[in-house]
């Protein structure tokens, strides 16, 4: 885990060969949706393991079949709220929840608009109550302009003040990190890698493309919804 000195509380896992190998497969344009989803699950899981190293632990006594010895429990692991930003974060969250199996889960549906404004539309929000003992993990694979996460973090504030708030992703652009840290300096950011920059469409370079489309397929744009008839 490497802290980036350009900001406080921003970490990458570029020193982990295995995490970098998974990221390499995700970047590959020939990686199919099945492998892409599995890669996001693996990244969520291994990044979750790394994040536990930053959490408070407690020493405990444990009885083995032979004698008593000393062990530890990761206290904060039992008080986690994972906020999932649909849709690319679904497999990523699946990996995180393998580490934080006690986590309560919130769901946010957010869509980023077109450049240059990149306005965010949020049409579904379900977040559990947040307590001062909680660590909130906002899971979003791609931290590009930061617009989506700024809106999500504003919503999270309405549900309580946690012990810590973490934004966890796969890739980030410096532009998005800067915007988040300017508005929410207390938020910690963990990503597999910080990439070079954004292009004029707001995509991360070199990036890995649209994570949602690559994981689940490109959606078909329907201008009118089909009429549904209900039978009583």
UniProtKB/Swiss-Prot annotation:
Pathway: Pyrimidine metabolism; UMP biosynthesis via salvage pathway; UMP from uracil: step 1/1. It comes from the Archaea. The keyword Signal does not apply. Transmembrane segments: none annotated. 5-phospho-alpha-D-ribose 1-diphosphate binds at residues 87, 112, 140-148, 210. Keywords: Allosteric enzyme, Glycosyltransferase, GTP-binding, Magnesium, Nucleotide-binding, Transferase. It catalyses: UMP + diphosphate = 5-phospho-alpha-D-ribose 1-diphosphate + uracil. GTP binds at residues 38-42. One of its GO terms (biological process) is uracil salvage. Uracil binds at residues 204, 209-211. Disulfide bonds: none annotated. Coiled coil: none annotated. Binds 1 Mg(2+) ion per subunit. The magnesium is bound as Mg-PRPP. GO terms for molecular function: GTP binding; magnesium ion binding; uracil phosphoribosyltransferase activity. Its EC number is 2.4.2.9. Allosterically activated by GTP. Its cofactor is Mg(2+). It holds the Pfam family UPRTase. InterPro entries: PRibTrfase_dom, PRTase-like, Upp_A, UPRTase/APRTase, Ura_phspho_trans. Belongs to the UPRTase family. PANTHER family: ADENINE PHOSPHORIBOSYLTRANSFERASE (PTHR32315), URACIL PHOSPHORIBOSYLTRANSFERASE, CHLOROPLASTIC (PTHR32315:SF4). Catalyzes the conversion of uracil and 5-phospho-alpha-D-ribose 1-diphosphate (PRPP) to UMP and diphosphate. This is Uracil phosphoribosyltransferase. The gene is upp.
């Amino acid at each position: 885990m490497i802290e980036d000195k350009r900001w406080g509380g921003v970490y990458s896992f570029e020193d982990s060969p295995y995490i970098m190998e998974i990221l390499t497969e995700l970047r590959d344009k020939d990686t199919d949706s099945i492998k892409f989803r599995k890669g996001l699950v693996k990244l969520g899981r291994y990044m979750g393991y790394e994040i536990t190293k930053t959490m408070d632990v407690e020493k405990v006594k444990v009885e083995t079949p032979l004698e008593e010895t000393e062990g530890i429990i990761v206290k904060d692991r039992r008080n986690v709220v994972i906020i999932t930003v649909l849709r690319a974060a679904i497999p990523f969250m699946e990996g995180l929840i393998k580490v934080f199996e006690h986590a309560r889960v919130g769901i946010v549906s957010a869509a980023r608009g077109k450049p240059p404004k990149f306005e965010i539309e949020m049409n579904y929000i379900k977040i559990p109550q947040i307590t001062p003992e909680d660590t909130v993990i906002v899971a979003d694979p791609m931290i590009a302009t930061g617009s989506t996460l700024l809106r999500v973090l504003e919503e999270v504030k309405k549900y309580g003040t946690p012990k810590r708030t973490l934004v966890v992703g796969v890739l980030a652009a410096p532009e998005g990190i800067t915007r988040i840290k300017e508005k929410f300096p207390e938020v910690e950011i963990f990503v597999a890698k910080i990439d070079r920059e954004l292009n004029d469409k707001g995509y991360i370079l070199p990036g890995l493309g649209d994570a949602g489309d690559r994981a689940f397929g490109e959606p078909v744009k329907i201008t009118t919804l089909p009429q549904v008839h209900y039978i009583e």
